[in-house]
Amino acid sequence: MEHTSKQPRVSSVRLREWYEHEKDFDKKGKTPQGESIDYRAYVHRTIRNFICFDWNLTSNTAMLQISQLPGRIRYRNVKTEFENCVKPWLEMSKFSLVDLHQAILNLCELERTGNGITRAHGFEIQSLQSRSISAKSGAGSVSVFGEDSVDSVFESMAEDGVGNLGNFYWLPRRGSIKEELRVVLVGSKNRVNFTAPSNEKIVRRIIADIRNHN
């Protein structure tokens, strides 16, 4: 645990291990009696998983960072595991979650009005009756917006719907973000995915943007 008078931080590093079937190393053989034997190869894999809870006492905001996990390990399980670990002295359930659903819609709308800080590569919106629509541009360098058919569907659905997913490229800005960075907002899981290694300054800038537009 690290802390200053304005910002405590709780970090954890955990070794995670699992076995994964690798077909390329499977073999076949026979018993002395001629019976077939199938040898299945399992590779012992390990990662060191970093988790950090950061609480800014000045703004009374916090964020939980989890390093990238392999597909078989669920982020929600790691989050619960960490919460249980610190629960005797830090009740994380007391913190309210940022509404990523609304942030997705607001960032898209900001772009559509010509004031965007992001470029949307794709989005998914769910209606009040649990029906969803999604759209995606043909390349990350092209906005999903710009055609009447897509724009009108977004406008209609966003009026009463919620943003389930936003696939954004954060645009370069003076003093913080030097080049485009793809960040995916998963509203249905309250999760922000950084798709490339990013330093703390960039992470904080993007999280602040999301807070400001939720």
Annotate the PLM regions.
Residues 1-214:
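Intrinsically disordered, low-complexity, charge-rich terminal extensions
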